[in-house]
């Protein structure tokens, strides 16, 4: 097994040649190959290959240029670092080189330098990655202790990176014409909305500082012209004439700037805004975190800002502008990233639950039920002769939650599994806010006024499971803290089994970092706070179940062009829908047989020409 790196004349899509391949098997002796046949002989003789981002770059590059098929085990230190170094802002070899005292040589020209210069860069990368691999392996062994369990986890990371690499290589057809039209339309709408917002935001006061003149009196003792202006100003400000400090005066009023975050926040604060969403910025020098209130999240106003709209309709203008700007950025991102009529579903990391972090342009896409969602998803289409299949696991997180609850509270889980069960109205009933007769009437369409009540209990159902407290719930819903606490109390009375499950889990602390083991996958997951135990285990179980389903499916078909949370987007030849559905259903059956969860997992399958047709 070797640690290796390659240098080529370009990125994967445009590379035409490999300059060199450097490697080591012991961290002491480093060799560099320039001959393609030597590279083939070396790579094909290895049972295992270690590298940084090799699944998505080095390996497909070698296969493309050398015309070989690599079957060795792949140990990719990039996703390993994502898991272990979860607070690290950069995971590139240059960053690790600074840590290890091995500077990464800087090269900007990949066509015209000598092969010795490329070889030097390549060798230094291998030195850095050897040190990184040794560090990662040692730290993972502290967590897993069992080599078989760790090997299973490494295989899992290899699989996930292979899924990402395959999707990137296939690409996703983009309707360039539709994206271009939407950019033009939204650019005009943005301009109109900015002008409208300027009419409802308060004007900005322009001030100046006035100071007492050096000479206020003439030689004859009379007041000078400068002195007269100063004393008049003091009189206007109702200040005594002996005052000699600074005076702030209003010079005029400027139009507001809707693109100024500071001005928008000042306006919202004047309306009684109480922020519920924050970003934490860390000071690199002091290490202290600064809590920054957020007006927007994922392209929409935060819940606490939306609460202002009922009493301040002008805030709805800000909501409209926020949505327009977010959607415009998506369409523009499509066009910026388009290449030969395609975009890629690229990844940018892993969460602590091992879900993909997605990368521009396919990130945070609004659903078809949201403003411009149909157009956004409608830009992603299938090429001629193909159709898209959207396959997602139905109620994945809720199913995983019921799996963990059932050993403690089987009666409630059975009730939750009944057709037509509404967890939000059930919680309201359990809290004494409504009766079963009210729920039945609502389901018949006779009590539409319960919709607002249901919305609040829906927020509680989703957020309480993940550790929300009454102050934050109050800010998000507009309820008093007392009301919010009452809802949380009702939730935990109904869902006591969640806490019972959490209490049964063991948290390990290693070098001041907390880790918890998933009971289904047996993988270890990092924890920031103890309150995150259930959310981490529930979401990671969902991610693992989804990935296992995808793994079974890929044994029959490898045509996935995108994965988002609990859905997979597959490219299918027209006329093969039945065979494709058979493969998806076979995969979920195999998964249920394999995992034997307390609640069976299910899937939903839809076909269409555009992403908007299938999800």
What positions do the PLM features span?
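Cytochrome P450 catalytic domain signature, combining two hallmark sequence patches
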Residues: 69-72, 191, 273-280, 405-418, ...
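Short amphipathic alpha-helices in soluble, non-transmembrane regions
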Residues: 580-588
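Active-site-proximal helix-loop-helix substrate-binding element of RNase H-like nuclease domains
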Residues: 12, 16-23, 27-36, 42-142, ...
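Conserved "right-hand" nucleotidyltransferase catalytic core of DNA-directed polymerases
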Residues: 1-7, 104, 115-372, 381, ...
């Amino acid at each position: 097994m070797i640690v290796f790196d390659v240098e080529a004349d370009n990125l994967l899509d445009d590379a035409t040649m490999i300059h060199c391949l450097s490697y080591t098997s012991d961290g002491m002796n480093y060799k560099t190959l320039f001959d393609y046949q030597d590279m083939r002989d070396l790579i094909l003789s290895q049972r295992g290959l270690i590298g940084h981002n090799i699944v998505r770059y080095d390996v497909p590059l070698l296969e493309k240029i050398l015309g070989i098929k690599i079957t060795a085990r792949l140990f990719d230190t990039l996703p390993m670092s994502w898991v272990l170094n979860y607070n690290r802002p950069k995971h590139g070899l240059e960053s690790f080189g600074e840590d290890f005292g091995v500077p990464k040589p800087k090269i900007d020209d990949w066509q015209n330098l000598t092969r010795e210069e490329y070889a030097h860069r390549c060798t230094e990368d291998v030195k850095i990655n050897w040190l990184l691999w040794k560090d990662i392996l040692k730290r993972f062994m502290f967590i897993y202790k069992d080599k078989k369990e760790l090997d299973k986890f490494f295989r899992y990371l290899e699989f996930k990176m292979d899924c990402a690499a395959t999707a990137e290589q296939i690409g996703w057809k983009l309707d360039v014409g539709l994206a271009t039209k939407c950019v033009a339309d939204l650019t005009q709408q943005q301009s109109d909305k900015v002008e409208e917002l300027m009419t409802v935001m308060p004007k900005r006061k322009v001030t100046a500082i006035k100071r007492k003149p050096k000479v206020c009196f003439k030689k004859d003792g009379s007041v000078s012209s400068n002195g007269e202006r100063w004393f008049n100003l003091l009189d206007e400000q109702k200040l005594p004439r002996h005052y000699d400090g600074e005076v702030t005066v209003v010079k005029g009023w400027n139009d507001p700037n809707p693109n100024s975050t500071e001005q928008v926040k000042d306006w919202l604060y004047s309306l009684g805004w109480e922020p519920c969403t924050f970003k934490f910025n860390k000071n690199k020098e002091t290490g202290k975190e600064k809590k920054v209130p957020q007006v927007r999240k994922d392209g929409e106003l935060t819940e606490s800002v939306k609460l202002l709209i009922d009493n301040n309709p002008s805030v709805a203008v800000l909501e409209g502008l926020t949505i327009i700007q977010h959607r415009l950025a998506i369409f523009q991102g499509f066009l910026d990233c388009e290449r030969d009529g395609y975009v890629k579903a690229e990844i940018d990391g892993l969460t602590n639950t091992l879900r993909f972090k997605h990368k521009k342009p396919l990130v945070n896409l609004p659903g078809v039920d949201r403003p411009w969602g149909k157009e956004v998803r409608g830009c992603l289409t299938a090429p001629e002769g193909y159709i898209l299949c959207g396959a997602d696991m139905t109620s994945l997180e809720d199913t995983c939650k019921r799996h963990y609850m059932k050993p403690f509270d089987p009666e409630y889980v059975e009730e939750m599994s009944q057709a037509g069960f509404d967890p939000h109205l059930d919680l309201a009933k359990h809290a004494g806010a409504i009766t079963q007769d009210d729920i039945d009437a609502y389901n018949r369409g006779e009590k539409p006024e319960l919709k607002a009540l249901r919305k609040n209990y829906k927020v509680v159902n989703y957020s309480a499971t993940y550790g929300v407290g009454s102050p934050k719930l109050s800010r998000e819903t507009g309820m008093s803290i007392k009301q919010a606490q009452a809802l949380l109390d009702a939730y935990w009375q109904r869902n006591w089994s969640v806490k019972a499950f959490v209490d049964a889990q063991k948290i390990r602390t290693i070098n001041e970092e907390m880790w918890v083991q998933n009971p289904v996958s047996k993988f270890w997951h990092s924890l920031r706070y103890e309150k995150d135990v259930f959310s981490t285990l529930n979401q990671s179980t969902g991610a693992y179940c989804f990935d296992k389903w995808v793994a079974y499916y890929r044994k029959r078909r490898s045509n996935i062009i995108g994965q988002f949370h609990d859905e997979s987007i597959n490219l299918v030849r027209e006329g093969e829908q039945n065979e494709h559905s058979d493969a998806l259903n076979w995969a979920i059956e195999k998964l249920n047989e394999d995992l034997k969860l307390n609640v069976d997992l299910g899937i939903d399958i839809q076909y269409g020409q555009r992403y908007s047709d299938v999800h």
